Structure formats: C-alpha cells, structure tokens
Amino acid sequence: MEHLLKLSSLTPDEIIHILDVADEYKRLHKAGTDPKDLQGKAIALMFGKHSTRTRTSLEVGIYQMGGLGTYLSAADMQIARGEPIQDTARVLGRYYDAIVYRTFKQSDVDALARYSGVPVVSGMTDYAHPLQVLTDLMTVREYKGKLAGLKAGFVGDGYNMANSLIVGCLMMGMDFTIACPNGYRPSADVLFFAREYGDHFKLTTAPDEAARGADVLFTDVWTSMGMERETERRRRDFNGFCLDAARMALAKPDCIVQHPLLSLIHISEPTRLRRIS
C-alpha cells in the first residue's frame, strides 16, 4: 500500500510514471474511452479546507474512471467535535478503498495514513500540495515537450505550493529560482533537500531574478486559507512580488505562467492572457 503525502516520498521515476499514465488517460478521455480502473471502488474526499478545483477534478475524475467519490466535509464530521484522527481513520478505512484528505496540518494527513489501513492522498496541507504540482508538471511537459533542462521561477510566498514545486521541479531536472520576502521562506527541510541540487536551485528576495530567462513562472496567493487576519500585513510585505508585463519581459518569449488560483492581485491582467491555469 502506498500513500501520496508529499512529493519527496516519490522517486523521479515514479513521478514520470504518474505523468505518463495521466497523459495516456487524458488521451483516452479525449477519444471518448475513459479507463475504468476505479470500477467498484469507493474514495472518500475528506475536506477541511475550501476547494473549487481540487474537489471538482477529483469528483469528476473518479466518476469518469468508474468509481464512487464521497465528499465529506470535516466540519460536519465527528472530528470537528474532537474525535481523535486515528478513530476517524480506522472508521473510514473500513468503508473506503482510499482517502483524499485536504486539511491544515500535515501531521493530520500523516496520522490518517498511519491508522486508516488504506491508501491516503494529500489534497493539500499547510506544508504541501502534491496533487497540484503533479498537475503543474504535467501541464509544463505538455506545453514544452520536456521537463529536464527547463528554467522555472516562483515569485511569492514560500508556503505549501512553493515547497512542493521546489521538490517536484528539482527532481525532474529543472532549474528552480524562488523569490520571496524575508520571513516567507520555504520550509527548512525543503531548503535542506534543495541544497543537494547545488546551482540548480536559488533562493532570493529579488523577483526579477526568478523571472529572468524563465521557461515557466509560478506564483501563488499571498494570504493562504487560515491566514485571513494577516491579509493587510501580507499585502505590504508582498508589494512588488507579482507577475506583470515588465517582469514577464525578463522571461523567455514563450514563457508560460501558472497560478493555482485565486489570482486576484498577484498577476496582472495582460499576464493572465498568457497564463495556463
């Protein structure tokens, strides 16, 4: 039994295999022949955070592959009343063949995987967003024809998206430069991981450095879910850390831009026209 809790738990070959399978499933879907690999399987979608794209893509994808996806709002479950995560995990594991869990604490996803007895996939935590980044890598490869050797830049908050992008891009042989203000660096263990890649990774406070010569640029929200009280301070701290026409001019002419949305003020309107969302 395997879980997908963070990208660093995978090998580069495993990531490539996932992308290859996803490409084939996409081809089959366009041809009108969805594979039914989940026929007779029940998947729990346990969400403790708001979601539009993650929930929608999972529910539709599970349905197209013949499975049953059950949306479970954590706010409506006994876990909201203090039930230990291990008890919830054991119960869900008896009914479902796999569980996707979207929540705040990475430790809660880890605990669910430890006690459920079925495969667990992270639908996002405050530490990582592996599904989003696998999809990002799939999109980059589709538009660029490859991953290895590309230059990727990230401008914004060194939070969950940045953590997973650093790991995923470096494992795929890409150069990665992240620009974030002081006090908003990626997690210490992710930076330790990135050091193994030497000059292929750079951390800076200068957004233009991340954009210069980039094949693909990523950004993210400045205020993630659960941080709403910090909105005004973060707007001040991240002033200038956006993708606009001047910054895009530093990237390669065929650079693509990816944002997990909501995009709001992090990306200018002209840049939106070049975005692959």
Model-derived segments and their meaning:
Residues 1-56, 60:
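Positively charged, low-complexity intrinsically disordered leader regions
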Residues 42, 47-95:
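Active-site cofactor/substrate anionic-group-binding motifs, chiefly glycine-
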Residues 48-60, 144-219:
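Glycine-rich phosphate/diphosphate-binding loop of Rossmann-like nucleotide-binding domains
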Residues 90, 97-168, 259:
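Anion-binding alpha/beta catalytic cores of soluble intermediary-metabolism enzymes, centered on
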Residues 93, 113, 210-212, 248:
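A short, aliphatic-rich alpha-helical micro-motif
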Residues 171, 246-254:
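Short, conserved loop/helix-junction motifs that constitute active-site signature segments
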Residues 221-241:
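Glycine/threonine-rich flexible loop motifs
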Residues 265-277:
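Single conserved hydrophobic/aromatic residue that forms the stacking wall/gate
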